Amino acid sequence: MGFLSPIYVLFFCFGVRVYCQYEAYRWDDDYDQEPNEDYDPEFQFHQNIEYGVPFYNNILGCAKECFCPTNFPTSMYCDNRKLKTIPIIPMHIQQLNLQFNDIEAVTANSFINATHLKEINLSHNKIKSQKIDYGVFAKLSNLQQLHLEHNNLEEFPFPLPKSLERLLLGYNEISILPTNAMDGLVNVTMLDLCYNHLSDSMLKEKTLSKMEKLMQLNLCNNRLESMPLGLPSSLMYLSLENNSISSIPDNYFDKLPKLHALRISHNKLEDIPYDIFNLSNLIELNVGHNKLKQAFYIPRNLEHLYLQNNEIESINVTMICPSPDPVHHHHLTYLRVDQNKLKEPISSYIFFCFPRIHSIYYGEQRSTNGETIQLKTQVFRSYQEEEEEDDHDSQDNTLEGQEVSDEHYNSHYYEMQEWQDTI
């Protein structure tokens, strides 16, 4: 037995060696294969979380009252959820949607970790000025857009961060605008204050002048009786509809050389300087629903002019276009003059001075006895270039008998030049 023991030991060692070589060959063969570059695990697992839960969702987090889509991990949607308070905002969130809720207060505690916020939408809530914690927005150093329209604000929210670019405060009850409210807002390009209670005393000369990058200012439906002073020269779009403005000072627009569109309809304008709108960049001008008795000089680059619902009895072409240039044509393409007191159509000479006109809308005119009359006229394009004629062959030149509402033309007006999309 002692003699066989060494032999058994040798056989055993040899067998073990062969088996190990075989097993090594099998595993080496498996791992020598080329890796699958298309392989992308659906989840990344962490030792401290439960299996089957996405790794990034647990790390980044989302308020339980809200929804954070996986394809937009930095956005949090809390809109239309009947919320009364703002939930705690996780640090990674950049876009916060809280519109259409019942929120009354904005507390600093909700934003204590929200250092990366770029856009906040708190529109259509019940927020009051006295229930906004002081400085809650100013601490958000990355904030670019703030929506607070359709709330119950009585005062301009102050202070605000320097990073802010778009501020929407329409449809509130704002009547107080502190002189230093705009201090530091050097990057704001769009400010909407329509449908508030602002008076002339709140818009002092230096209130808006420091906003050096402001391009769009909406002050429609307030309580203004005069043109706002101290507007920055960067302004391109100015909305002043539905106020009580009765006059425009001489040379008022000299400091606004970049102005592209001016809306000052539904005011009390009567007499304005003849060449007050002589601006080289002005494209759209709406002075409808005022008390103007005569037309004015039309600048060369103006394309859309709205004169409806005034007191104009006649339009002298030589007055609106004193020196036609056959080389550098005026750009006017659309003119609306309905609901005035015109007794006859504008002279056909207008098409020589404005060869690009596509249509003149006369609609109904008001007579001295209060009745309405319909002018019998057609719009001709005899001075247009041949290509323009070909493009419009299929259109009807006759405007007779058409009824055009303000809403219809306002919508068209916005389609032609959507202000907010240009900013």
UniProtKB/Swiss-Prot annotation:
It comes from the Eukaryota. Residues 381-406 are annotated as: Disordered. Glycosylated; contains keratan sulfate. Residues 53-91 form the LRRNT domain. It is found in: Secreted, Extracellular space, Extracellular matrix. PROSITE patterns: LRR. Pfam families: LRR_8, LRRNT. This is Osteomodulin. The gene is Omd.
